[in-house]
């Protein structure tokens, strides 16, 4: 079975920095440490309210990341313009609400088809690979195909938040089915949201998955074990699931 890649989301390094309005800890430094520890890519979410990652971070990270930069962003003219100026390797289009603590669900691609298709086309024409962050739903996968996006990222939050083993298994089966369906259509499949050291293995074991994007649990463990070890330990969990 092929190995699975780890994209490390470093948003919450910026959250910690912004809590005191200081210049540290710097997400640029975090990206370097994460890459040395085995991260296959670095993910950042430039939110419209700039609550963690800011424009300066995006600009410098694009110049310094040694692996691949994945820029998460809302489908707005401002964000598309920033992406076209920055030219990260990947853009993941996500839904965004100012009042949410974190992204609460997948993008309604089917309900915003023309808007998302237009953004996808602009980014693709600039040589940027586009992923759409969606729930594990066939209608949304079909809409992704219609948009021309080569990647989806399946939302694993419902799986991560399930309160019983039965509910978690049901969510895992939905994700597995969606991954198989998307893969069959020629779409590459990533996944992420709410994944931890305790729940990542069943997701990582799904053979169609190309990459997992994980942030909060890694940054949280880094507070106790250091970022290098936190990233390396997550990579071990994921690769063990593929053996």
Swiss-Prot record:
One of its GO terms (cellular component) is cytosol. 3-amino-2-oxopropyl phosphate binds at residues 9, 20, 194, 215-216. GO terms for molecular function: pyridoxine 5'-phosphate synthase activity. It is found in: Cytoplasm. InterPro entries: Aldolase_TIM (IPR013785), PyrdxlP_synth_PdxJ (IPR004569), Pyridoxine-5'_phos_synth (IPR036130). Pfam families: PdxJ. Pathway: Cofactor biosynthesis; pyridoxine 5'-phosphate biosynthesis; pyridoxine 5'-phosphate from D-erythrose 4-phosphate: step 5/5. The active site is at residues 45, 72, 193. 1-deoxy-D-xylulose 5-phosphate binds at residues 11-12, 47, 52, 102. Catalyzes the complicated ring closure reaction between the two acyclic compounds 1-deoxy-D-xylulose-5-phosphate (DXP) and 3-amino-2-oxopropyl phosphate (1-amino-acetone-3-phosphate or AAP) to form pyridoxine 5'-phosphate (PNP) and inorganic phosphate. Homooctamer; tetramer of dimers. Belongs to the PNP synthase family. This is Pyridoxine 5'-phosphate synthase. It comes from Photobacterium profundum (strain SS9). The lineage of its organism: Bacteria, Pseudomonadati, Pseudomonadota, Gammaproteobacteria, Vibrionales.
């Amino acid at each position: 079975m092929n190995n699975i890649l780890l994209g490390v989301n470093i948003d919450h390094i910026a959250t910690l920095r912004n809590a005191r309005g200081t210049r540290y800890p710097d997400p640029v430094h975090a990206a370097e440490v994460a890459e040395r520890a085995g991260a296959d890519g670095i993910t950042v979410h430039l939110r419209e309210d700039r609550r963690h990652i800011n424009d300066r971070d995006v600009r410098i990270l694009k110049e310094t990341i040694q692996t691949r930069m994945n820029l998460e962003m809302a489908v707005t003219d401002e964000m598309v313009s920033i992406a076209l100026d920055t030219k990260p390797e990947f853009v993941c289009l996500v839904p965004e609400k100012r009042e949410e603590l974190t992204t609460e669900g997948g993008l309604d691609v089917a309900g915003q088809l023309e808007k998302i298709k237009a953004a996808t086309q602009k980014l693709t024409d600039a040589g940027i690979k586009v992923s759409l962050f969606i729930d594990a739903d066939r209608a949304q996968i079909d809409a992704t195909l219609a948009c021309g996006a080569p990647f989806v990222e399946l939302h694993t939050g419902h799986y991560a938040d399930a309160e019983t083993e039965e509910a978690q298994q049901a969510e895992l089966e939905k994700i597995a089915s969606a991954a198989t369906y998307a893969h069959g259509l020629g779409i590459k499949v990533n996944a992420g949201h709410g994944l931890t050291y305790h729940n990542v293995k069943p997701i990582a074991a799904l053979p169609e998955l190309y990459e997992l994007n994980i942030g909060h649990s890694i940054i949280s463990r880094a507070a106790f074990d250091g970022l290098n070890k936190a990233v390396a330990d997550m990579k071990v969990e994921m690769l063990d699931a593929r053996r």
